[in-house]
Amino acid sequence: MLQPARRKYRKEQKGRNTGISHSRGTAVSFGEFGLKAIGRGRITARQIEAARRAMTRHIKRGGRIWIRIFPDKPISQKPAEVRMGNGKGNPEYYVAEIQPGKMLYEMDGVDEALAREAFRLAAAKLPLLTTFVVRQVGQ
């Protein structure tokens, strides 16, 4: 699973996931087809991997897949049945915070019908709304 190799600080505050993706990471840059987020939320490293596996299994050895997001925010949790207080819990997993317009995955080397179905299977593993996009001519 994806996670940062090192961090300056182990724990991070919750923060608020606001705004939209304006220019960076909003266009199909590497492949021919893309899966773009139209909802807002957090995607865990496990969900990113589950979606990648679903796509890879569907296209078999056909094309190439790019993952355009990385889970770099640690989420801490206290153990079960522990009383409140006594500090913040330990980092349990990592998430990528997603704003609307962010490109999640890209694919190349397959036809559109196969890519559309692979992205549909991947979208079922993700907790936010997505849409299928095709690279524009001249991009």
Curated annotation (Swiss-Prot):
Record protein name field: Large ribosomal subunit protein uL16
PANTHER family listed in its UniProt record: 50S/60S RIBOSOMAL PROTEIN L16 (PTHR12220), LARGE RIBOSOMAL SUBUNIT PROTEIN UL16M (PTHR12220:SF13)
Positions of region (Disordered): 1-23
Any Gene Ontology CC annotation: cytosolic large ribosomal subunit
Any Pfam family the entry gives: Ribosomal_L16
CDD domains: Ribosomal_L16_L10e (cd01433)
Gene coding for it: rplP
Record's keyword terms, sorted: Ribonucleoprotein, Ribosomal protein, RNA-binding, rRNA-binding, tRNA-binding
Its job: Binds 23S rRNA and is also seen to make contacts with the A and possibly P site tRNAs.
